[in-house]
Amino acid sequence: LATVLGPGVTMCGLHTNSIASVMDNAFGTPWLVSGALFTICLGIVVCGGIKRIGSISEPMSIAMCIIYLILTIGVAVLNASALPGVFALIFKSAFGLEPVFAGIMGSTLNWGIKRGVYSNEAGQGSGAIMCAPTETSHPAKQGLVQVLSIFVDTLVICSASAVIILCSGFYNVQGADGSLIVSQAGDTPYGILYVQEGLNSVFPGNWSGMVLAIATVLFVFTGMMGYYYQAESGMNYLFKGKRGAVWAIRAIFLTSIFSGVLMENEGLWALGDTGVGLMAWFNIIAILLMCKQVKAIMVDFEEQSKKGLDPCFDPSEFGIEDTTGAWDRYAEQKKQRS
């Protein structure tokens, strides 16, 4: 239920808002036009089913990451002399060593955790849904891949955004009382526009901001396909795969997507945080209840790896009933090797 309400309803409008803002800033595209076109294109994909989602999202994900990292490298090269100061500022601010920001350390930590979890989805349980269809001989393999994805998302992609913003100097910092401690971005709303205007200030012309707008569309498009996959999976579980339920979540999801251009940024963030919190609380409780079993599965994986074997999983060894038969082949392989 939390998976349906989070990715399917409360968390998706914010991303459409980001697309509309960067497209308006780069090309002057009206918000309603951006929202309508994005919703229609996404609707074509999600109505094509889960297989179409997988075939489209993989190449787009690779392309968008490459584009974004190339832009970041360009900013870093052009501002190489500023990089030591940028990283010093990051660490000083993080640990309250920068006098200007010391008073808002708690707020900084709070916002960092909220936005970080929103980005990498750590602890929400959504990663398990996304990787469940993969074919692997041992669940620990896929678990390690998911850990790597969180690392890449947080320490590579999110850090790239930080480098662009801090190197360009285009940002505001708000104090605990709402006043601006640092005001270098004027009235520009916080978020993706800091990155876009930061790029425009580093590279000549507005081409980099336009490239970012296109990359953002790709980022959000693939992300929303993932959101829909999670929501549909939850709906299928609740209603045993009934077609009416699937079409209902499609309609609700696409309506929520379009609502992003009709609502204010603050309200969308509040809705998104609610969805993230809803998923995380339920999932973290489940993680704590299953931690002993997970540890045993990881030990099994490591023991087989140390022997030079390709780890195979037998759910019966851990008291797990495999009603689908998904692990039968690997369980048999493990028994034959014993």
Describe every region a protein language model picked out.
Residues 72-89, 103, 133-134, 148-191:
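Extracellular/periplasmic helix-exit of transmembrane alpha-helices
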